[in-house]
């Protein structure tokens, strides 16, 4: 890994004085200086320094600035600051959903949600209607016996019903968890069976790419394999009747009932998100009502600069943390856009059309989509009215320099471009958007407030201007409270704290520049990350190796220099098998059916074998490093593998590919 340049270039974009003055983070800094001793001068760098040095005071200020309603007061901000195990706002009780629906009191007839399908015609839902539906469904969940701590699951696309179900679950103190309906049954069960849901919200199918996709057989399999279910709720997106024994959605949201918000401890679970499952079952990551509330208020209200006048559109699905992040836009009183459809239907410019028709002020997408638009010769600034868009944000992978230039040239010059980076693990950003700072090509603007983000070398020494491991040295409120089914905390500890005890190590290569920006170089582990969605290699192995022709397989994901992502599947065939067009088609079909279209590899390549550790584990990271151009002797410890000749094969393959 080479050292990244840190000399600041001329900014691609610089906010003008008026924009800096009216930004929420500027007003917050002035208020915090008056009330909490924050530095009045020095702009964002001084505020960030104060936020990590005076961590408790900073988070107290966030709670006060956003008027967080504690139904019982907290004893102190941070009872225990050790990682893992930080104890935030002990003694406090509150409810996330109550805060998400607060705008209904003052602006009942304004738009809370804009639902957009592949017709690209927005359908509004007011704050009053959203609150009413949440109140009705919450009462029905209580009638079904859902109690605080019970898990409620959704097999749903990005539709208003999913938001209502999440908020109603949070209102009663339940724990929400969701998967997108393009997940196959096995992928869903690997997640939901861990948390044992008592209610399952499902659709009969969904529309994507101009086609209807019937999921009733998958839903039937989920019902059969989830014995803890007390109720299944049918949402007829394709117009089919509810199957036997299922409740109909319309009847559950028909009442005019004021929501009752269960007041739960700050650390009470809000939802379960899932890791990719690279080394087995996905990790079931539990985040708290209070932790998500204050972290998302900070991130969306200060960093993204969202408020009641804004419209927030991020292309996502319910299987990605960005959906949860998107829903939290409601906390700031913002109108949230829910786009349920293909990112490229009927053409590559689809997302820009949605941004235009919804009047989006902050539009978020993947870096891969930006680069696809550039390659497809899309001209969003010419072909769409994007005058409302203040910021285009990207995540999922680092936005390449050409992506910055393309957005600047093809949307407009006065455009805030926010490349952001975080993780499912915290459901937030470690670094990214700051409305008062300049944007430099290829760089994230700065580390987030309250986040002591550093780059460490292997010895644990902080480095500037050099590539190192992304670490966070102080606790964040949205860090997991625990993993599900991890009673001694060992899996949680090993995931983040094994390399540097007491310090969060995330698994990204980064450079922190001497002007405070951040450059992301990609994953330092082998997690697959395609279009912003982290996926597990274990899921792919399980599906592919059911085919009798496949002896073993290996899948690798590589970030390309041009911003692309190459995901080859290497297959070691059974004796007598041939990798012909028929077998390739069956491999692809198996992956599509059992997992999702996103899991389908870019290439399927026959290999003489799959290398392993001495304990029999497939070697992924060394193969990835070989494909990235790392010499064999630096990519792997020769004494730790079962067949060094196999690794020489992959090294030769990499050399051939590079030409």
Task: Describe these PLM feature segments.
Residues 293-311, 321-361, 376-377:
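Conserved AMP-binding/adenylation subdomain of ANL enzymes
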Residues 302, 339, 390-517, 523-527, ...:
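Conserved AMP-binding/adenylate-forming
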Residues 157, 199-218, 239, 340-344, ...:
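Adenylate-forming
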Residues 167, 171-251, 358, 366-367:
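Structural core segment of the AMP-binding/adenylate-forming
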Residues 46-50, 97, 113-167, 184-189, ...:
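Conserved AMP-binding/adenylate-forming core of the ANL superfamily
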Residues 154, 179-204, 219, 344, ...:
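AMP-binding/adenylate-forming catalytic core of the ANL superfamily
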Residues 234, 593-618, 631-657:
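AMP-binding/adenylate-forming catalytic domain of the ANL superfamily
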Residues 109-111, 234, 245-274, 281, ...:
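Conserved pre-ATP/AMP-binding loop-to-beta segment of ANL
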């Amino acid at each position: 890994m080479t050292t990244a340049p840190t000399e600041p270039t001329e900014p691609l974009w610089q906010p003008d004085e008026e924009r800096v003055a009216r930004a929420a983070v500027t007003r917050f800094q002035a208020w915090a200086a008056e009330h909490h001793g924050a530095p009045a001068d020095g702009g964002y760098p001084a505020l960030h320094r104060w936020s990590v040095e005076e961590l408790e005071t900073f988070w107290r200020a966030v709670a006060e600035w956003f008027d967080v309603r504690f139904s019982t007061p907290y004893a102190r901000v941070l009872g225990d600051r050790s990682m893992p195990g930080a104890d935030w706002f002990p003694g406090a009780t509150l409810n996330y959903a109550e805060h998400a629906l607060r705008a209904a009191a003052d602006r009942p007839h304004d738009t809370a949600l804009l639902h957009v399908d592949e017709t690209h015609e927005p359908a509004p839902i007011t704050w009053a209607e959203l609150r009413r539906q949440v109140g009705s469904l919450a009462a029905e969940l209580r009638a079904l016996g859902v109690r605080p701590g019970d898990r409620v699951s959704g097999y749903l696309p990005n539709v208003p019903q999913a938001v209502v179900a999440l908020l109603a679950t949070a209102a009663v103190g339940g724990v929400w968890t969701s998967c997108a309906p393009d997940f196959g049954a096995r992928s869903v069960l690997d997640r939901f069976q861990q948390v044992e849901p008592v209610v399952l919200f499902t659709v009969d199918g969904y529309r994507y790419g101009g086609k209807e996709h019937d999921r009733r057989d998958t839903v039937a399999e989920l019902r059969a394999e989830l014995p803890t279910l007390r109720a299944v709720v049918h949402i007829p997106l394709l117009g089919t009747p509810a199957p036997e024994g299922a409740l109909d959605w319309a009847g559950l949201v028909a009442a005019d009932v004021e929501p009752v918000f269960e007041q739960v401890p700050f650390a009470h679970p809000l939802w379960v998100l899932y890791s990719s499952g690279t080394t087995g079952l996905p990790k079931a990551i539990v985040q708290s009502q209070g932790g998500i509330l204050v972290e998302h208020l900070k991130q969306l209200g200060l960093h993204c600069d969202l408020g009641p006048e804004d419209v927030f559109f991020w292309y996502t699905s319910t299987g990605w943390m960005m959906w949860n992040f998107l829903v939290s836009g409601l906390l700031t009183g913002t109108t949230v856009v829910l786009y349920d459809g293909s990112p490229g239907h009927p053409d590559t410019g689809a997302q820009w059309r949605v941004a235009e028709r919804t009047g989006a002020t902050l539009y978020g997408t993947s870096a891969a989509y930006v680069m696809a638009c550039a390659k497809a010769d899309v001209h969003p600034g010419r072909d769409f009215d994007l005058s409302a868009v203040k910021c285009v944000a990207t995540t999922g992978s680092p936005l390449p320099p050409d992506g910055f230039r393309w957005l600047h040239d093809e949307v407009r010059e006065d455009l805030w471009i926010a490349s952001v980076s975080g993780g499912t693990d915290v459901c937030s950003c470690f670094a990214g958007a700051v409305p008062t700072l300049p944007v430099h090509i290829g760089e994230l603007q700065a580390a987030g407030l309250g986040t002591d983000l550093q780059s460490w070398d292997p010895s644990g020494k902080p480095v500037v201007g050099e590539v190192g491991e992304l670490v966070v040295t102080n606790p964040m409120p949205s860090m997991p409270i625990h993993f599900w089914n991890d009673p001694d905390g060992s899996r949680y500890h090993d995931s983040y704290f094994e390399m540097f005890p007491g310090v969060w190590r995330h698994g990204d290569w980064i450079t922190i520049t001497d002007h405070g920006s951040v450059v992301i170089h990609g994953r330092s582990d082998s997690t697959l990350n395609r279009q912003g969605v982290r996926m597990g290699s274990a899921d792919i192995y399980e599906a592919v190796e059911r085919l009798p022709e496949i002896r073993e397989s290996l899948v690798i994901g590589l970030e390309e220099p041009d911003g692309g992502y190459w995901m080859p599947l290497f297959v070691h065939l059974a004796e007598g098998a041939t990798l012909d067009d028929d077998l390739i088609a069956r491999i692809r079909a198996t992956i599509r059916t059992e997992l999702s279209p996103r899991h389908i590899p870019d290439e399927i390549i026959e290999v003489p074998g799959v290398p392993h550790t001495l304990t029999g584990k497939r070697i992924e990271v060394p193969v990835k490093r070989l494909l990235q151009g790392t010499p064999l002797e630096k990519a792997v410890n020769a004494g730790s593998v079962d067949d060094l000749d196999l690794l020489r094969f992959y090294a030769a393959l990499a050399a051939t590919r590079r030409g």
